[in-house]
Amino acid sequence: MSEHVLPAEGPMRFISPIIQDNPTGWGPYEMPDQFRDMPYQPFSKGDRLGKISDWTMVQDKKYQNKYASQFGAGSSYAYFHDEDESTFHLVDTTRVQKPYQSYQRGRARGQRGRGARGARTPGGMTTLNKPRERKLGKRWGQRGAPMKIRDASVTVRPTWVTIEDMDFPRLAKLSLPGIKEGEDIVSCGTLEYYDKAYDRVNVKHEKPLQRIDRIFHTVTTTDDPVIRRLSKTAGTVYATDAILATIMCCTRSNYSWDIVIEKIGDKLFLHKRDNTEFDLLTVNETSVEPPADDGNSINSPRNLALEATFINHNFSQQVLKSGPTEPKYKFQEPNPFVSEQEDGEVASVGYRYRKWILNNGVVLIARCEHDAVMQGPQGETQFLTIKALNEWDSKLANGVEWRQKLDTQRGAVLANELRNNSCKLAKWTVQALLAGSDQIKFGYVSRAQVRDNSRHVILGTQQFKPHEFAAQINLSMDNAWGILRCIIDICMKQKDGKYLIMKDPNKPLIRLYDIPDNTFESDASEESGDEQADTPFAPLYSYGNSKRV
């Protein structure tokens, strides 16, 4: 083998680099040619790339050094404000007083959709949501605004004995399915035909509401001659459609009301007290902000109820074809409440006395009402229930402007009425179902001027089938029958006597009282001797009595 011998290398030489001496500082003082005219920005490898928004200049108030950079990154894009005297001008700093209500609504919108625990405002303050606010308020002993105390419909006397309290959550779970359609026993009265020209009324072609001088009879159960006659041969429970609707829809009510129940043997008579506000229509009863209870205002609950009743009576008669030559629909018997002494014209109304079997020997007989009739598509006769919704002041009622929305967004208007008048609409629907009406027709009536509650205009009409409308407003007739049957069973277990069921004015429950037999009899005799001006309708409208419109 031969060995390879590497050639010998020469001695290594050190080549000294070119050193640039900078007598005034450190580092090179000349820019190499390959780096000349090249832009440069100080940076840190921990910084994110991007220049659309430089967040490195943001300082967290809790952690001051959270975004801090020791390399001066982003300083070339930082904004430094220089005062410009040329654009300086005075600004009017006068505070404008804003309505309290609008301010609250704005705050609610601003906080909606934020986190469950709270949200941070631009000023750095954390806002709590409502449940957390209430929880902290209770912890520290804080109290909110005082709850509005409503008056009871009747003063509870010391001699009354409370039998049972029935709260709304329990009543809402009751159900009595399988109740068949009512059977007609007696039919009375005369009905006029509906004028279909009012179906074409709209906001642009409104019609003024007229005052129709007709007599309305609001006779209670025990004063009805037909019910007195039927009680001898049929039925165990007797009432009117208005009384039944009030009981069946009690879970939707906020205002106080009362119904007198008399038990005689195995029979129950449900009736209302004389000269009360039972027949007045509530306005915005279920609204988040109900009308303020100011007796001097035209927008107080009582004055609004009088106005709504006035509108309903006149509207239900104005939309009919009235006149001596117009055809009329007559039932088998005449109106049982018309006497020979009455000199006025009686309103168009038909009475149906119907029977329902509620099982276990309970047979209900009730007087129901129709307002009009009309010809159906196939020429058949259809019975109508006619009611009117009234607009009083959309700003105070937290509603929508009917004149702006009614023609284009009628569904929104009706949805708002369902929120504000859920109890009233449910009672109207129950009355139409009990009477067997084929259609329920609503009229939209508004004030001609917001501050004038004596002049009104008709802005439109809308028609529904009662069963379809009941499903739309989530009204369960099985639950309604269950509530009625529950109250009937409790009363049937009591001894013979007089009882009163009353909605608590400030709690979601109804109470059943055992009252003396002579209760309200002395009140009726005293009220019968009062002047005519003390009737419920006298303060607003020049009615001769509580039955005339």
From Swiss-Prot:
It holds the Pfam family eIF-3_zeta. The keyword RNA-binding applies. Keywords: Cytoplasm, Initiation factor, Protein biosynthesis, RNA-binding. InterPro entries: eIF3d. Residues 106-117 have a biased composition (Basic residues). Residues 277-291 are annotated as: RNA gate. It comes from Bombyx mori (Silk moth). Belongs to the eIF-3 subunit D family. PANTHER family: EUKARYOTIC TRANSLATION INITIATION FACTOR 3 SUBUNIT 7, EUKARYOTIC TRANSLATION INITIATION FACTOR 3 SUBUNIT D. One of its GO terms (biological process) is formation of cytoplasmic translation initiation complex. Residues 101-130, 521-549 are annotated as: Disordered. GO terms for molecular function: mRNA cap binding; translation initiation factor activity. The RNA gate region regulates mRNA cap recognition to prevent promiscuous mRNA-binding before assembly of eif3d into the full eukaryotic translation initiation factor 3 (eIF-3) complex. Component of the eukaryotic translation initiation factor 3 (eIF-3) complex. This is Eukaryotic translation initiation factor 3 subunit D.
